[in-house]
Every structure is written in C-alpha cells, then in structure tokens.
C-alpha cells in the first residue's frame, strides 16, 4: 500500500506542485531587503558603534580619569593619561586614546564608566582609507560626542529602565 501511495505521489508530482506553490508565494511577497546606501533600517538603542566622549550640558567633559574603562577593556585598546588634581579635587584626562583596530566593541567600557563619559554611539559608517585614521584621540572622541549627543542621550534614556 505504501508503494502505491509513493508511486501516486511521484506520478502526480505532488512534491513539485507544493514546492512550486511555495516559490510563487515567496516571489510575490514583499521584499525584506533594503537598498542600503539609500535606505537605512532602524538601529537598536543598545547598538554599539563608534566611540564618543560626552560632555556635560555646561560644556565640561564628563571623564573623571578614573581609568575603569582602561582596566576593563579586554582588548587593551584604551589608553588614558590623567592630569593633576584640580583645586576642587577632581581630575580630567590629558590623553584619552582608543585604538579602534584593537577594539572588539564589547561595550564593557561603557558599562564600567560611572559618569557615562565614554559611550558607543549609533554611528556604524566610519570606514577609513588608512589604519592611522582608526587611532582616536581625545579631540576626535569629543567631536564624535558633540556630533551624536542628541541620539546618544536618547538611547541612554531609553535603556535606563534596564540598567
């Protein structure tokens, strides 16, 4: 009986018909791809892209030179040099470098920072022509923070209930 059923299936091309029907359904379904350079999909608030150093609303940089991000970085991509203590007892960085070639975008630096100074922003389009352009210094990181501050603040606020 099973052999008769199998012969009927192959004679009537049941598998072919079901596969063809599936192909036709997928052919006329809406496309799932985006035309990337011209269309961009949504980015999660937790997306880890290009690094940035943030400032307070009064313009002062947030980094207090605690060096927690440097200590926790598994790739040892962060180098910080702290300046002398100021009159109010706080410190600021003299040098803050990130080697983006070494960085593995794990987000540990962002999680370790007690003042949300170093963040990974929403920018994922930072391809360069030379390797040297991927060595970010403090000025480059602060410029990134200034450029993306609105989006970074929105993403941190959206993620705040889960921290």
Swiss-Prot record:
Q: Which Gene3D superfamilies match?
A: 3.30.70.3270
Which molecular function GO terms apply here?
Answer: 4 iron, 4 sulfur cluster binding; iron ion binding; NADH:ubiquinone reductase (non-electrogenic) activity; quinone binding
Reaction catalysis annotation:
a quinone + NADH + 5 H(+)(in) = a quinol + NAD(+) + 4 H(+)(out)
Which top-rank group of organisms is this from? Bacteria
Q: What topology does it adopt in the membrane?
A: Peripheral membrane protein
Which stretches are transmembrane? none
Describe the location of the 4Fe-4S ferredoxin-type domain by residue ranges. 53-83, 94-123
Entry cofactor note text?
Answer: Binds 2 [4Fe-4S] clusters per subunit.
Q: In the UniProt record, does the keyword Transport occur?
A: no
GO cellular component, alphabetical, reads: plasma membrane
Assigned protein family = Belongs to the complex I 23 kDa subunit family.
- Role according to the record: NDH-1 shuttles electrons from NADH, via FMN and iron-sulfur (Fe-S) centers, to quinones in the respiratory chain. The immediate electron acceptor for the enzyme in this species is believed to be ubiquinone. Couples the redox reaction to proton translocation (for every two electrons transferred, four hydrogen ions are translocated across the cytoplasmic membrane), and thus conserves the redox energy in a proton gradient.
Q: Fill in the subunit field for this protein.
A: NDH-1 is composed of 14 different subunits. Subunits NuoA, H, J, K, L, M, N constitute the membrane sector of the complex.
Q: Please report the name of this protein according to its UniProt entry.
A: NADH-quinone oxidoreductase subunit I
Record organism: Brucella canis (strain ATCC 23365 / NCTC 10854 / RM-666)
- Gene designation: nuoI
């Amino acid at each position: 009986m099973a052999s008769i059923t199998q012969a009927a299936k192959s004679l009537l091309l049941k598998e072919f018909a079901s596969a063809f029907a599936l192909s036709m359904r997928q052919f006329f379904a809406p496309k799932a791809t985006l035309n990337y350079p011209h269309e961009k999909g949504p980015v999660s608030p937790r997306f880890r892209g290009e690094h940035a150093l943030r400032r307070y609303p009064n313009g002062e940089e947030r980094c207090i030179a605690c060096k927690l991000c440097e200590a926790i970085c598994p790739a040892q991509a962060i180098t910080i040099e702290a300046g002398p203590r100021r009159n109010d007892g706080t410190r600021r960085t003299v040098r803050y470098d990130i080697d983006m070639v070494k960085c593995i975008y794990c987000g540990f630096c962002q999680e370790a920072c007690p003042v949300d100074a170093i963040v990974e922003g929403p920018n994922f389009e930072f391809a360069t022509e030379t390797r040297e352009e991927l060595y970010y210094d403090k000025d480059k990181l602060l410029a990134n923070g200034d450029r993306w501050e609105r989006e970074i603040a929105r993403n941190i606020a959206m993620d705040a209930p889960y921290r």
